[in-house]
Amino acid sequence: IEHWSDSHAAELHSRLDAARSNSEGLISAKDVTWLPPLTRPGKICGVAMNNSASNDRKIKAPDHPAFFLKPNSCLIGHGADLTVRSYYGSVHPEPELAVVIGGRIRDAEPEEVMSQVFGYTIFNDVTGNGMRAQDMFQYYALYPKKDNPDEVERVEQHLSYAARYKGTDCFGVLGPWITTADAIASPDELAVQCFIGEEKIADDNTSFYNYKVAEVLSFLSYFQTLSAGDVVSMGTAFKPGATRKSIHHANFLKVGGPVSIEIEGLGRQENPVIIEERELGRWRLS
């Protein structure tokens, strides 16, 4: 990715044209085992609460993008079993546009970042609401007093750390492929749909994101260096479908699957949902 250029794109198109002309060598997409197009990205950055449809639910929120990280061990590809263990509690899909970084981005203004975007793909940011609730803390944070930094004050806060409810195995479906940036006129105007079986549970558009792709990448670059192969997932598109049911009704333990996501210009991702009935194993020392 880091060394991708227009000449590489031309060579790839030439090879694809040659492959299409040789029908005997063609393999049906149904016969292919799809891995994530990036199996070991350096980091997967997710943007929290970036859909304007969620703004009326915010009691207090920052005026800039907020991020969390997912480990690459959570990744599976299109068509792979999305395995959910019963002890996870409620788990639902989150259809998102993913940006694949093509070069180093650090301290970059929004007008500068898009030249370092390699392409785009579909990301199902699978989320465990049950584990989010289990990992909730209500506590007093300690801060230096504004009028006397030698003393501290206690401020009541609520927080939940995202490692389990965002980073569990199978909680990141990436693919099926990467569409190069030159093929997408505007990543900020793409239709997004999500289905459970044949039922549409999300019918949205990336135009409803609070922050555009360039803004997200720029803001993030002032804190974390983005490198070739990194993935930035832009946030959930969750405007309900025609049935008015939403992704928040789609607890895999209740509705099963398959789950599929379509994004305009990027294709369709679909995965069977496998429920493992089991209890959490012993983890405390005797």
Segments from the language model and where they lie:
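A conserved acidic, glycine/proline-rich C-terminal tail/linker
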Residues: 212-254
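Glycine-enriched loop-and-adjacent helix/strand subsegments that border the catalytic/binding cleft
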Residues: 41-208, 212-216, 278-286
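N-terminal non-catalytic cap/leader segment that marks the start of a structured domain
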Residues: 1-66, 88, 258, 262, ...
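Charged, cofactor-coupling segments
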Residues: 95, 176, 238-286
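A short, charged
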Residues: 1-30, 135-136, 144-158, 227-239
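Residue "hotspots" at secondary-structure boundaries inside conserved domains
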Residues: 36-37, 43, 89-91, 218, ...
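Short strand-turn-strand beta-turns centered on an Asx-Gly dipeptide
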Residues: 196-198, 235, 264
